[in-house]
């Protein structure tokens, strides 16, 4: 079948589909979109905090970021210039697909220009606020 548009759930799914041969693209509307971030943390009282710390240090290094950007099931955007440079050197086709080439229009330009906005940290909304939001969302 064909799909003209669908609600975005992340460029990672587009990357997975594209790599499988699907002719799809992620596009940020001119009106803008939301950017979310994920983080790694070490739980209080962790029995292996030293190993977790080493893993976080690796995955946030340029080499780890390139590995993460090239993952088959969950390719992610790289948050560091050195990571972008290494990705362009090692897998230029993936750097281009993800819009992480420094000498071309890229995702960072969209963030700077306000086209992509960071999702704000959650606040404790009332159940009524959530229900109102959900009703508005469903009716859109």
Residue ranges and their predicted role:
Residues 20-44:
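Periplasmic-binding protein-like
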Residues 10-14, 39, 52, 56:
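A general structural signal for well-ordered alpha-helical packing
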Residues 34, 43-111:
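Mature extracytoplasmic/periplasmic domains
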Residues 8-9, 36, 130, 134:
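Tryptophan-centered motif/residue detector
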Residues 107-140:
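Conserved C-terminal helix/tail region of periplasmic/extracytoplasmic solute-binding proteins
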Residues 2, 10, 17-18, 44, ...:
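Sec/Tat-exported extracytoplasmic proteins
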Residues 1-29:
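Ligand-binding pocket segment of bilobal, Venus flytrap-like solute-binding proteins
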